[in-house]
Design a protein with these regions (language model features):
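Short-chain dehydrogenase/reductase
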Residues: 47
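Catalytic nucleophile serine of serine hydrolases
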Residues: 40
């Protein structure tokens, strides 16, 4: 596997474990907020998890829906932070 795939898998596992959503509900492109998977508190917990698990720091200006809307967008954000 490659790094981006590994990141996606780790994030998906976290989302499923913490929200009790079924794996069938959490696809790479599923809108996690529009589908009600995460609320504002879940978002804060997600940020804390990402910063801890991937040893990155998200700037306030990066906390945009576009960066955290789906597994794909979260993984892309994490991947870009790791490679900077």
């Amino acid at each position: 596997m490659n790094l981006l795939t590994d990141i996606k898998n780790q994030i998906r596992d976290y989302v499923i474990e913490t929200t009790y959503a079924t794996p069938e509900k959490i696809k790479d492109e599923t809108s996690l907020f529009k589908e009600g998977v995460f609320d504002s508190m879940g978002f804060i917990m997600l940020i804390n998890y990402i910063e801890s698990a991937f040893e990155i720091k998200a700037k306030d200006t990066e906390l945009l829906e576009d960066n955290f809307e789906s597994i794909n967008s979260i993984a892309g954000f994490v991947y870009s932070k790791i490679n900077n």
